[in-house]
Amino acid sequence: MPNVQQSAGQVLVVADDFTGANDAGVGLAQHGARVSVVFDVNTLHADLLGDAVVINTDSRAARDDVASQRTAAAVAAWQAVGGKGWIIKKIDSTLRGNLGAEVAAALSAADVPVALIAAASPTLGRVTRQGEVWVNGRRLTDTEFASDPKTPVTSASIAARLAEQTALPVAEIHLDEVRQANLAHRLQQLADEGTRLIILDTDVQDDLTHIVNAARALPFRPLLVGSAGLSDALATAQDFTRKTEKPLLAVVGSMSDIAQKQIAAARLRSDVTLVEIDINALFSPDSSTVMASQCEDALKALTNGHHCIIRTCHNENQRFEIDARCRELGLSRQQLGETISHYLGELTRSIVQALDSLAADGTRRRLPGGLYLSGGDIAIAVATALGATGFQIKGQIASCVPWGYLLNSIVGMTPVMTKAGGFGNETTLLDVLRFIEEKVSE
């Protein structure tokens, strides 16, 4: 089989309820996609397509024939307004709803040879073993979902649930085989044999990533069937990012665990560049040369439309090495912190001035789309280096990131965001990136 890597294209998600629609859509949005959730297919038009459209058919508790009709109509409506790309049939990770009817309808409407069914959401404790759904270590039929008052589940077997509403040929690929390098070849083989529904075991999120990569290697786009975990995996594989006219410059001096997780989440986007600061280099005779190099790296990222994150903490062990570092340098903790903060302030000023000097004419300044300052000492050091005399608060992002404008600083009315190092969750920096992108587009 030739190695055919599918291009990005758009994404359609067909969900059977509103909360499930949002669960699937948020994973795409967090990776830079422009996502709309649509309640009525009759209101769908080309302007809503963006990168991804999620259509809620509200059919989980409907009759199977109604669920089938609504699912087919959703796919047809998307195609009619010009939608092209990947189609995900979002299902409940505990198999509630009209599983067989909706998958069969989506497969027929999409007019593709096969559906890949990966129902798991490992990060939520839902996995697939030997074709059965397990929730937090318990077989599905031994959990509360089996007695759901509206849509009870009578079997943990995905194949059995499908067979209740469709007679399409089914095959299972268990975990050992899922993790093989030739998974795409195996999928093609089953499709060639006439299998229409392929159930794949999944134990961790990386398994879903491997499944998506195998799907992308096929010469056709299969229908993807799964829960939020699968849409997250597809979002990771897609490149939804676009060049940002005025990207964010983030300076993160916090060594907190959550700050590092926030950076890790942001780095999943292909339009984010990381500039690492080696603390040892700050105290070397060549520190000015090092700063010039870091300034150049940041400038290159920003002028290429990439958000740039500057950080001083490279791994979780650094916080435990501070005392040893202080002894080596003959400094107190306070002196070390002040030196680092001052350096980051000067580096930020150098980057801002270098970027501004690239302006095509003297009447329109060229500045970052925003500044994000994480860590209290870092925030005040940068503000001081930029000449600020105060801060005008305008609002808050993600419940923990005040934003506003530095008063009398060289960055003028550039939005500035500050965050205490340990605040927020893993998606906080992603929320900041989206805020800046929306702010710049206004």
UniProtKB/Swiss-Prot annotation:
Substrates-to-products reaction catalysed: D-threonate + ATP = 4-O-phospho-D-threonate + ADP + H(+)
Source species, domain of life: Bacteria
InterPro entries attached to this UniProt entry: 4-carb_acid_sugar_kinase_N, 4-carb_acid_sugar_kinase_N_sf, NBD_C, NBD_C_sf
Binding positions for ATP per the UniProt entry: 254, 375-378, 421
Coiled-coil region(s): none
Recorded GO MF terms: ATP binding; kinase activity
Binding site for substrate: 17, 60, 90-93
Functional note: Catalyzes the ATP-dependent phosphorylation of D-threonate to D-threonate 4-phosphate. Can also phosphorylate 4-hydroxy-L-threonine, with lower efficiency.
Listed name of the protein: D-threonate kinase
Annotated organism of origin: Pectobacterium atrosepticum (strain SCRI 1043 / ATCC BAA-672) (Erwinia carotovora subsp. atroseptica)
Lineage start: Bacteria, Pseudomonadati, Pseudomonadota, Gammaproteobacteria, Enterobacterales
Protein encoded by which gene: dtnK
